A protein has these predicted regions:
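Active-site or metal-binding loop neighborhoods of secreted/extracellular toxin and effector enzymes
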Residues: 324-389
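Short, motif-level signal for alpha-helix interfacial/capping segments enriched in acidic residues
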Residues: 28-30, 278-283, 313-331, 373, ...
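Extracytoplasmic/periplasmic, Sec-exported soluble proteins
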Residues: 10, 49, 293, 297-302, ...
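Short amphipathic alpha-helical segments that mediate assembly, nucleic-acid/protein binding
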Residues: 128-134, 208, 220-224, 237, ...
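Glycine-rich short-loop/terminal segments
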Residues: 178-308, 315, 319, 388
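N-terminal secretion-targeting helices of virulence/extracellular proteins
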Residues: 1-184
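Well-ordered alpha-helical scaffold segments within catalytic/enzyme domains
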Residues: 307-314, 347-352
Length: 389
């Protein structure tokens, strides 16, 4: 995320200058487009020009006309993105200055390098005057921490606003300009809000591709075959997934499973997605669902993998649920949304096995999102994995 100092020192003058240059380019591009149409396209279209030369020239003229139109639209989009980014970062910078210069002194706080919040007069156990007349030392200390946390959170939110605008603008400019310098991309993004949606949908699609590959690869891996052989090789009561799952082959298999899915383990995909997309602000961790005004947490992907690969390993549904809800798997201590995600993974394996297609997984994820969103709209506050976009 952009640092406190980076937001305050953001080169907004350069950004405004760039936006002005693109705005200045829009009018002459439009004029060239009109002139080419009136002086070349229309006269040729109204003439009786025929033959080999005409057959070769007309497609080329159409291409030039299209490029002029596309260049104008691209310039308009880039200008819009730059203006939006300037506004959002400027708002964030002004907010940081207000929090630092106005709100912090009111709250008895100072904001130092890195946006670190400190009390002007810290609570001192040896100085009752720092506690106030109505609080004891521990109450005063708790109040001091709470006030500092409130201000720190506001500073982080301002930084996040600048960070998200900067990231969305960079992505939009890459989309708008395209990979080929000789081609124009008129169907890009014309503002930061649209770019945030496009970036969110891109992360959703890439995450689905990533977790599908992980599910197919890991369910067919030697490690799963080893676990399945151990688990299937013994009968008996259900065991608990843990580092010391118990004696016998079943306990050994569950202990091996634990090592794969524990927090930070090879099959804990949350940090992998965090690194893949450089997720930093709270909003970064929610991906926009294509075609829906709803976003979904990156949590669901590791949960779906956990259920699918766990069933491929021969681990029973109750054992998988018990392991996750005990807070010992990579899914952590779960809520109902986590449970729904894991059950989707289990259902996919039980229904399709190793023949599951990407389309089948995608359909299941969309249904999961719709089910979660319906519950959230009905007032279920535990559905933290989805929220309005």
């Amino acid at each position: 995320m952009l640092s406190y100092e980076q937001v305050l020192a953001a080169p907004l003058e350069e950004l405004a200058e760039a936006a002005a240059k693109w705005q200045a380019a829009i009018k002459p591009l439009g004029e060239q487009q009109d002139a080419y149409r009136d002086r070349v396209i229309v006269p040729v279209r109204d003439s009786d020009w025929q033959g080999a030369d005409a057959d070769a020239a007309k497609p080329f003229m159409d291409k030039v006309s299209k490029e002029l139109r596309d260049a104008t639209k691209e310039a308009e989009a880039i200008h819009g993105v730059l203006v939006d980014a300037h506004r959002e970062i400027d708002i964030a910078r002004l907010d940081l200055r207000r929090l630092t210069d106005v709100e912090a002194p009111k709250m008895g706080r100072t904001v130092g390098p890195g946006g670190e919040v400190k009390p002007l007069r810290p609570v001192d156990p040896d100085d009752p005057d720092t506690w106030g007349p109505h609080l004891d030392f521990f109450q005063a200390l708790a109040w001091e921490e709470d006030v500092s946390k409130q201000l720190s959170k506001a500073i982080i939110n301002a930084r996040a606003r600048a960070h998200e605008a900067d990231r969305a603008a960079a992505w939009a400019l890459w989309q708008d300009t395209g990979a080929d310098d000789m081609e124009f991309n008129p169907g890009g993004y014309a503002n930061v809000s649209a770019a945030k949606g496009g970036l969110g949908e891109s992360k959703f699609r890439e995450s689905s591709d990533f977790i599908f590959a992980e599910m197919k690869t890991n369910s067919a891996s030697p490690k799963v075959a080893e676990i399945r052989g151990l688990v299937k090789g013994s009968e008996g009561p259900l065991a608990v997934i843990s580092p010391v799952a118990g004696v016998g082959s079943r306990g050994t298999g569950l202990a091996l499973w634990y090592e794969q899915v524990k927090t930070g383990g090879p099959w804990d995909h949350k940090p992998q997605l965090e690194k893949k997309f450089d997720l930093q602000s709270n909003n970064d961790f929610y991906f926009k669902v294509p075609g829906r005004e709803v976003s979904v947490s990156d949590d669901i992907y590791s949960n779906i993998h956990y259920g699918y690969v766990g069933r491929a390993a021969g681990i029973s549904r109750p054992e998988l649920m018990q392991g996750a809800n005990g807070g010992i798997a990579s899914t952590g201590t779960n809520d109902p949304g986590d449970d729904m995600s894991m059950k989707v993974g289990m259902d996919l394996y039980e229904k399709y096995g190793d023949r599951m297609t990407k389309e089948q997984m995608d359909a299941a994820i969309l249904k999961l999102v719709d089910d979660m969103e319906a519950r959230r709209r009905a007032g279920d506050t535990t559905m933290t994995q989805v929220r309005p976009w």
